[in-house]
């Protein structure tokens, strides 16, 4: 979370004073203001300390850095969520793409979610939201019904159109982990169909090169990648291009990117435009 103001360098969320907080994952980001992961963990520790004893912390049980945050001091009841049956809240995927999963609470199945969202990250998001609502007394059956009606938000694998058998998605890709899990969910849904990615490193952290080494692996499931490497990038985009498994090409501007996509795309393809610009 970004800092509050030029005179208050604490992350904005320390002012929220939540009764229930979801800690979904913790990775290095916002390289323009944080020097390292430890600095981000300190801010999360401050957030944890603001949640009262009568509140609840819902924590991704798979995340080692969040476990380290809790070890810094936590006096609020904690419930873990994830894919592990030992967690208080567990998701058991019924479809590989994440569009259907069973919800298990303390070893007992409480319902099934079927929705249009894809990817493990969305399964965890939905599970955490359900756990948070249950923590404040919302009926689980009502939560399940609400999740089934949820149609996601803008720019999160949003289908913007289909033309000549080509489906185009808009995705707010801000971090390699999010890119990887988003594409993995799409791959599970479309099977062997071609996935073509138009990638722009647009966030401050991306442009500074903080995630450069992780970018190529995050694109592993793509069959083709068109990488928008603007001349002002301060890091070597060619090194990333060379490490991408699929057919990859760098272009210098948006017009060249569109021209390359037109040449690449064919009926049956899934074209994902990934940029947070």
Where are the regions a protein language model picked out?
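Flexible active-site lid/hinge loop adjacent to a nucleotide/diphosphate
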Residues: 1-73, 116, 176-180
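N-terminal leader/targeting and accessory segments in enzymes
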Residues: 56, 64, 90-92, 118, ...
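Short glycine-/acidic-enriched loop or helix-start segments at secondary-structure transitions
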Residues: 6-8, 32-33, 67-70, 90, ...
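ATP-dependent carboxylate-amine ligase
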Residues: 19-20, 45, 74-77, 108, ...
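Short, polar loop motifs at secondary-structure junctions
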Residues: 61-65, 83-84, 232-233
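Active-site donor-binding loop signature of nucleotide-sugar glycosyltransferases
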Residues: 83, 115, 253
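Extended acidic/charged loop-beta regions that coordinate divalent cations
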Residues: 1-28, 67-112, 149, 153-156, ...
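Short, hydrophobic beta-strand segments that form beta-sheet elements in well-ordered domains
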Residues: 56-61, 77-82, 225-227
């Amino acid at each position: 979370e970004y800092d509050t103001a030029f005179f208050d360098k604490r992350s904005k969320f320390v002012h929220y004073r939540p009764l229930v907080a979801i800690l979904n994952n913790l990775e290095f980001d916002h390289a323009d203001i944080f020097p390292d992961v430890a600095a981000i963990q300190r801010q999360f520790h401050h957030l944890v300390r603001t949640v009262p004893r009568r509140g609840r912390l819902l924590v991704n049980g798979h995340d080692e850095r969040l476990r380290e945050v809790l070890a810094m001091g936590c006096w609020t009841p904690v419930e873990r969520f994830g894919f592990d049956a030992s967690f208080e809240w567990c998701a058991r995927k019924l479809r590989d793409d994440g569009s259907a999963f069973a919800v298990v609470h303390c070893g007992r199945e409480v319902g099934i979610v079927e929705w249009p969202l894809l990817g493990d990250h969305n399964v965890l998001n939905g599970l955490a939201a359900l756990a948070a609502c249950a923590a404040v007394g919302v009926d689980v059956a009502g939560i399940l019904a609400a999740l089934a009606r949820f149609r996601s938000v803008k720019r999160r694998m949003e289908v913007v159109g289909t033309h000549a058998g080509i489906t185009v998605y808009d995705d707010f890709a801000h971090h390699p982990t999010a890119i990887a899990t988003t594409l993995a969910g799409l791959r599970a849904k479309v099977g062997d169909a071609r996935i073509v990615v138009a990638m722009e490193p647009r966030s401050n952290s991306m442009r500074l090169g903080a995630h450069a080494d992780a970018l190529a692996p995050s694109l592993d499931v793509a069959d083709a990648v068109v990488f928008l490497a603007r001349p002002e990038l301060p890091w070597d985009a060619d090194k990333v291009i060379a490490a991408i498994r699929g057919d990859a090409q760098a272009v210098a501007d948006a017009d060249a990117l569109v021209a390359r996509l037109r040449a690449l795309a064919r009926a049956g393809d899934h074209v994902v435009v990934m940029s947070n610009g």
